[in-house]
A protein has these predicted regions:
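Outer-membrane beta-barrel "beta-signal"
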Residues: 50, 155-167
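Residue-level signature of outer-membrane beta-barrel architecture
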Residues: 39-41, 52, 71, 89-91, ...
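Flexible, solvent-exposed loop segments that connect beta-strands
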Residues: 24-33, 67-83, 107-129
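Transmembrane beta-strand segments that form the barrel wall of outer-membrane beta-barrel proteins
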Residues: 29-41, 62-73, 105-107, 143-154
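Short loop/turn motifs that connect adjacent beta-strands in outer-membrane beta-barrel proteins
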Residues: 23-32, 55-63, 77, 92-99, ...
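Cleavable N-terminal export/targeting peptides
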Residues: 1-28
Length: 167
């Protein structure tokens, strides 16, 4: 019985070492562009972003830079907008499935209305936005995908999903 246990352990280690040698799928080529559009919750909002592959083989993945425009309604009488540059590290697990980490920083504008006891007062302010997302993307066609991301920035959605067009 001891011998069978040793054989089983050796077989398991051999399988693990063989599967560890499996190669990741080829990453996106330099010059590939991706346009994303989506909606988010917590708080409700919408996003449009653009990514451009600048390095196609970086730590077994690809590195993109781009920009993002976000809109949200964090509270009943409040709206927020931001324009941010973004940097993303992506890794193709299969030809159809990609995981990524994104960092953003930029400028946000918030406007809101409140009652001061005698009249409605409208005001706004500008602030620095910074945040990040961890997400995934699944291509069900060569150039069309769905994506989901979790993370966020102050006043903007913590969970968002949408579609991506790769060209």
């Amino acid at each position: 019985m001891k011998r069978f246990g040793k054989v089983l352990i050796v077989a398991a280690l051999a399988m693990v070492s063989y599967s560890a040698k499996a190669e990741l799928e080829p990453q996106w080529e330099k010059g590939t562009a991706v346009l994303n559009a989506g909606a988010g919750i917590d708080p409700f909002g919408a996003t449009v972003s653009f990514d451009y592959v600048v390095v196609d083989q970086w730590w077994k993945g690809h590195f993109t830079v781009g920009g993002e425009f976000d809109f949200s309604v964090p509270y009943k009488k409040e709206t927020a907008y931001c324009i941010t540059p973004r940097a993303t590290y992506g890794l193709n697990i299969t030809p159809e499935f990609e995981v990524h980490l994104t960092a953003t920083t930029g400028v946000g504008i918030r406007s809101w209305k409140y009652w001061d006891g005698s009249k409605d007062v409208k005001t706004s302010d500008t602030y620095v936005v910074w945040g990040g997302y961890a997400g995934c993307r699944y291509f069900f066609m060569d150039n069309l995908a769905v994506f989901a991301e979790v993370g966020g920035a102050w006043l903007f959605p913590a969970l968002r999903a949408g579609i991506s067009f790769k060209f």
